[in-house]
């Protein structure tokens, strides 16, 4: 019999689901409860009953599970960004390992080794990029923060534990300067107000800092003075203004101009020199990304005469980080700015197109074209978005028949699905390594090694 809304029941949390919610069972139904830990015993209010399962929230914690720790962020619950801050990092790593194992066993139906997750070098202050929505609080003051789950209500946050302290301090100072200059925050309901988002990025190894104002309009009143003040106080390498006057939840508009500095920052990732503005995709946790890239390189097992194909290559960092191991690299990416960045990096490294060729194409279309041309890469790396690879891409990969396919994924479910498809078309799943790029959140990456035959 289904539960009823507002019904109070006592539950013991058994495990965490792959979205970070605690899972318990009662009367044959699963109940999902946010911000709980395995072993917790709690009085739970049913907030959303369904036919065969329900969602609840803790009314009273009766007994804490062994992995529960003191919550050290006052807005972690409503903010929704740090869904796992209430459990120890050891417990978090165990849960993330299980997320990936469950995906490949249950969804992929694959009997493949999944070692324990490779934990992140740092669990706090690790983000090299943040995009903060700008709004007003109940007193009319300008604030930044994060959207509450499943809403566009801003939860004000002055000290996000995941981003460097200077980003929090810069956000607070910017809000004060906006108020002092009579500049308003954007209101998406009325499509009025000026500043929509603050975008900040840091070169992790270089220390260079970028700030971009995303504005509804052409710029800011007193823009030069505000930017000069912030550049001086926070040692900013560059400041930009991005114009977004559309009624949209897409953060960045199409037009960006530089106010101060070079318009980009420089950094290195796995030894590859990079230049980044605001449009380029870049892993937000540099040290952990280097752990992931090292595992991908190990799985690739490249040889000196090999041809490496890097699909969904972004700025080319994975492929370029492996180029010393092989003879030729072709990278494919659909975002023009990323492809230009990859080409620029290759040129800075003294590589011509015969050695490192980057193409602006859809991954599936490019893979199909290469297969039709008779291309036979020895190793293919794919790093698709959360939706995974489409069947056209997988079909072309199977047709090109590389000896090794390395999949990098931010979604274990779609990675398991795609790996299963490849195992049905001539490949064997050798190993799946979870890697934690996003400590204190529900997200986990994985690297999959598949070999021909």
Model-identified regions with their sequence ranges:
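Terminal RNA-binding accessory module
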Residues: 1-71, 75, 358, 365
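Short beta-strand micro-motifs enriched in acidic
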Residues: 36, 45-49, 133-137, 201-205, ...
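Short, conserved phosphate/pyrophosphate- and ester-handling motifs at nucleotide-, phospho-/glycolipid
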Residues: 39, 163, 285
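Extended interfacial segments that mediate partner engagement and assembly in macromolecular machines
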Residues: 59-71, 77-185, 205, 220
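Carbohydrate-binding surface patches
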Residues: 199-203, 208-219
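Short, acidic/hydrophobic/Gly-rich beta-strand patch recurrent on exposed beta strands
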Residues: 22-27, 145-148, 212-214, 342
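Rossmann-like S-adenosyl-L-methionine
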Residues: 2-7, 18, 218-233, 237-453
């Amino acid at each position: 019999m289904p539960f009823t809304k507002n019904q109070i029941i006592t539950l013991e949390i058994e495990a965490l689901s792959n979205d970070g919610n605690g899972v318990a069972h009662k009367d044959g139904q699963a109940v999902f409860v946010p911000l709980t830990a395995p072993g917790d015993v709690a009085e739970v209010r049913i907030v959303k009953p369904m036919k065969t399962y329900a969602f609840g929230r803790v009314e009273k914690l009766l007994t804490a599970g062994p992995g529960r720790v003191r919550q050290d962020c006052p807005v972690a619950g409503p903010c929704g960004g740090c869904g796992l801050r209430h459990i120890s990092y050891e417990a978090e790593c165990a849960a993330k390992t299980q997320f990936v194992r469950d995906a490949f066993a249950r969804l992929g139906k694959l009997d493949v080794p999944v070692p324990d997750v490779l934990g992140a070098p740092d669990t706090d202050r690790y983000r090299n990029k943040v995009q903060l929505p700008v709004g007003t609080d109940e007193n009319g003051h300008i604030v930044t923060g994060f959207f509450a789950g499943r809403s566009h209500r801003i939860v004000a946050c002055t000290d996000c534990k995941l981003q460097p302290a200077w980003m929090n301090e810069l956000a607070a100072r910017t809000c004060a300067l906006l108020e002092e200059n009579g500049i308003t925050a954007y209101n998406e309901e009325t499509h009025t107000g000026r500043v929509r988002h603050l975008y900040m990025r840091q070169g992790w190894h270089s220390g260079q800092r970028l700030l971009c104002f995303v504005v509804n309009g052409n710029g800011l009143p007193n823009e030069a003075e505000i930017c000069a003040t912030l550049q001086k106080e926070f040692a900013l390498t560059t400041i930009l203004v991005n114009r977004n006057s559309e009624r949209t939840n897409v953060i960045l508009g199409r037009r960006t101009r530089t106010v101060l500095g070079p318009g980009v920052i420089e950094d290195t990732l796995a030894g590859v020199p990079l230049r980044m503005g605001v449009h380029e995709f870049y892993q937000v946790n540099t040290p952990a990304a280097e752990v992931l890239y090292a595992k991908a390189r190990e799985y690739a097992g490249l040889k000196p005469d090999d041809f490496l194909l890097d699909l969904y290559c972004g700025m080319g960092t994975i492929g370029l980080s492996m180029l010393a191991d092989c003879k030729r690299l072709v990278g494919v990416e659909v975002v023009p700015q990323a492809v230009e960045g990859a080409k620029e990096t290759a040129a800075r490294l003294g590589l011509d197109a015969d050695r490192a060729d980057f193409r602006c194409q859809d991954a599936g279309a490019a893979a199909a074209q290469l297969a039709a041309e008779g291309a036979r890469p020895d190793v293919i790396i794919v790093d698709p978005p959360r939706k995974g690879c489409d069947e056209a891409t997988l079909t072309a990969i199977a047709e090109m028949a590389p000896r090794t396919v390395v999949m990098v994924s931010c979604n274990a479910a779609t990675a398991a699905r795609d790996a299963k498809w490849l195992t049905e078309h001539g490949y064997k799943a050798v190993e799946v390594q979870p890697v934690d790029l996003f400590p204190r959140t529900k997200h986990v990456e994985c690297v999959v090694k598949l070999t021909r035959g």
